[in-house]
């Protein structure tokens, strides 16, 4: 039978893992290997994908992929991974004690003043970025779904200016399956850091040590940060740190990154191993007696054959050998082997496969997990089921239930929009508007009393205060929206949304993982585009990038709020929600079009770990809100301020630089009149409206500041309700800001960026025209 045929609660032992290529390798790296025992936890509300437990953690898998995995039913899972009933409470040695790994004066110390460079490497969602913040004093964003870090981040260890530490994207192995794995692997191989800090989730140690073993093979000085030890001990578990050090041959430091416990000791070990270049004491993890020694002999024979090539290419020999056996094409290409050498290696691997009874990739994965099992059996007392896990199961019965998941998601999103636009955000906005209005009146009075020049007076009041002030008044709405998005992300709910939305997204040609960048897109398109780097398929990544501009970003909120309050005051929440919904609908429509034209084929398999629900940290939420508020304020007082002053100048002077009494005679009117015919069919033939939309290409918030300057509070007399609706739809769909286009250019290239800009404007024009025509027919 296959894994697909198992029911909820049933357990089985894996016999064979079908499939081929990078995806199959990814399954093996995640622990889906022959002999592994799995239990089906649940199915998504739409019946696909499934959630299963393997090696002590939860993994999602599509039914189509599960159909390629043959299993045999077992009555219950074995308890061989529980480890000893009790371990000794020997104190963990400090730096230099016992002489195991830090013998004073040993090694070949680096010259004084040479920069110590570190790679911070670990699985996704293991607390890596939290540790980076503790080590460097940075405030990088921390989340509770796989793939928060999508690019490398650099910093110096506090009080050690001669150090440089790089926070790399979270990975499960050194196999090049996803973009983040390629980024992390290339950094370690090409940049050759002086040392590696490998962060391991102590609550999920079996899965995490799989990556650790590959890092040890790279023969780079390394220290292991055993994170979340507080959670292990709180749930009656324990780990013999001294013994695990001896088995792995590197220093192991128990820490809690979230509570900043053990971090100082970790820093001392990290500085020492980098300074003295103390390399791992062990790289050979296959016993020569295991399964007849087939894998052991193969690795050593291949290592001998490629030794000269590996040294010449600068690739660690042991790492290169295991990767070649796995079938890693990138490593094979780097070594430049001749045909005779390739044939000899292939002969060795085929012989090993016959003796071992497993294919090459499965044999290497099994070798690693066998060693990990031996370590855990002798050093780890499994914690009882944690409070977090029990709580997560209870919450999931509702939030990911068969009949409740989709309704709960809709209710949650509606509640977010209602509280943002009608209650909390709107209330705070009103207070800020009163403050800005009072400050404007006070400044106006002071300038008048001082007899300030009329031009300067107009610039300050009509340009800066009226323009920038109108944008600033929308800060509470933006902060409120990000507050709720942050709660959803930190709690782990967004990962669940990806799980139960996968089947729905697959119908439009995407994977459930694409939901994460799209949800981020409701905040800002720039990080949403960057977040697509976590997608394993280039096809999915490109398609998701092209769809993110349809998700209405927070920078458009001031436009919506401005026109909704002016033209639809009694139906604000409904109109706002309708705009967001329209953006999603148009995005889905174009997803179907892209699937049939530019991106034919099926979406890649959905393989994702589901983290436990966690209470969002107040510090992390406040930090995120401050970052977003700071970004908004910086934009308001740079790009928007400059744009506002420029608009004021152009609408106050004619082509001879004489001040005009009627803005119709201004430079701005002359420029904007060129594009007025384009917008006239939309009911937007006023040159001032055209000008505001052009300024929105720089920053969407500029639309409101430009309107305030040009109309001076009389916009309701210049537009009809239908024209306002047409303008709202155009603003929703037209080209994203310069920063977003720049991020698309960085990810896809200039041609794609220009295409996105032109296509979005064309889509917006057509949609606004349809609104206009339908409105006229109904009137």
Report each predicted region and the residues it spans.
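Extended, low-charge hydrophobic alpha-helical regions
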Residues: 355, 362-366, 382, 426-464, ...
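Conserved C-terminal guanine-recognition region of P-loop GTPase G domains, centered on the G4
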Residues: 160, 185-252, 559
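Transmembrane helix-loop junctions at the membrane interface of multipass transporters and ion channels
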Residues: 550, 554-577, 739-749, 768-779
